Amino acid sequence: MVKIIGITGGSGSGKTTVVNKISEVIPEFVLISQDNYYKSVGDYEYEFLDVNFDHPDAFDNNLFYKHLKKLKENKLIHMPLYDFINHKRKDETVEIVPTPVVIVEGIMIFVEERVRNLIDLKIYIDTPNDIRFIRRLERDMSKRGRTLESVIEQYLSTTRAGYYRFIEPTKEYADLIIPEGGHNDKALYVLSSFLRTLGQESSVFF
């Protein structure tokens, strides 16, 4: 059976760095980003939320769960792609063929119990707010066509509140909490050693 590793934490916490570290231990896996499951801005729910990207209802949670469940059952999916510049889902999708290990990352992947129940190893990246904000600012301006003013406004109006309301409380579900994210060499070493040990004991880990 396919095993799923879930990596969560606030925006800019260093989830991608941890994924890269895992890739040194598990050479073959598919990566599912929850970001691709954002609803398009034109959806009814977004009008209700006033385009709040930091609320669980901003995601197509039913499709996200359906796809993870299919991957868990070793079935292929067609993952959506999200356009962050135009804030809508692209017309094309990506065919994802499951591998023995699937890594899923996103800010709210531990919020729903049905999704948590599909994840075999839950990792929470705990990084200071100021560091996360700086990383988010750099990313959104360089890769998502955002202005400095718009990123700051979003952070103050929804992102900060959304983190404390929805994301941070999910730490209690984590099997492993990594402070400082990808810069915590000792924690990443422990994680890598753990995965290597499991790999020696099982052909599919876990």
Swiss-Prot record:
Task: Spell out the subcellular localization from the entry.
Answer: Cytoplasm
- Indicate which residues the UniProt annotation says bind ATP: G9, G10, S11, G12, S13, G14, K15, T16
A molecular function annotated in GO for this UniProt entry is: ATP binding
Alphabetically sorted, this entry's keywords are:
ATP-binding, Cytoplasm, Kinase, Nucleotide-binding, Transferase
Catalytically driven reaction(s): uridine + ATP = UMP + ADP + H(+); cytidine + ATP = CMP + ADP + H(+)
Record-stated family:
Belongs to the uridine kinase family.
The cross-references to HAMAP family, in alphabetical order and at most eight, read:
Uridine_kinase
User: Can you name this protein?
Assistant: Uridine kinase
Q: What is the lineage of its organism?
A: Bacteria, Pseudomonadati, Spirochaetota, Spirochaetia, Spirochaetales
